Amino acid sequence: MRAPALWTAYLILLAGCANGPAVSERTVAAPPAVVLERIGAKLDALGFTRSGGQPGALAARSDRSLPAWATCSPALVGDGDDRRVMVSAERRYAEVRVTAAPAGGQAAVSIDAAFRADYRNRLRAASFQRRCRTTGTLEALLLAAASG
């Protein structure tokens, strides 16, 4: 009789640990051009460099991404023999693409953020990159800026 109760408790605890997807879309009561201007100003303030974008869109990148914006898991590296060591992310990068489309006198804003980090395998004197998982923090900052 205990097993079902323990199993239920385990599932409830596990569900409490799960994070939902980051909110990356919102409708804002402003024209799309104004929304993109607000988000662009926020990206500039955060140290992003804007790259060419299409009308109704904005693209930017940063080579100094903050750890609060994404979770970069440690990586297990080796030398090909028996030696293994865990390494942490070093330099972090972020790329953001923002679109703002007209939506009945408002703007439908969508933010697509991608993160990656450099890792160093000191055993082989080699570097590599891995993707990192968003925390939703950057997206929330940009959506707040979109609202003014």
Regions found by a protein language model. Give the residues of each.
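Bacterial N-terminal signal peptides that target proteins for export
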Residues: M1-W7
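C-terminal motif of bacterial Sec signal peptides marking the signal peptidase cleavage site
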Residues: L13-G16
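Ser/Thr-rich, low-complexity intrinsically disordered terminal regions
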Residues: A18-G148
